[in-house]
């Protein structure tokens, strides 16, 4: 149960971060409305709050979170940008998630 809770929290955290960065990108590069900055700021605040909910030392959380962030970012690439990740992208995600699991769940 802890594994599912931790992984789900990482996914929500990554989505908040990606959305918080994607909206200013739309404003700056795709001629989006300046009003996109408001939900972007809210999303980044939610991202910071979600990071505080993780049940271990901050440095370990940030290191492990990177693996899940890569997974979610490639999902975003596929679902939002419409670009299917390559085989090597999937291999890289597998390696990153294995690293995340070692960092988060190794006996201490």
Swiss-Prot record:
Pfam families: UPF0060. The chain crosses the membrane at residues 7-27, 33-53, 63-83, 87-107. It is a multi-pass membrane protein. This is UPF0060 membrane protein Mfla_0485. GO terms for cellular component: plasma membrane. Signal peptide: none annotated. NCBIfam families: PRK02237.1.
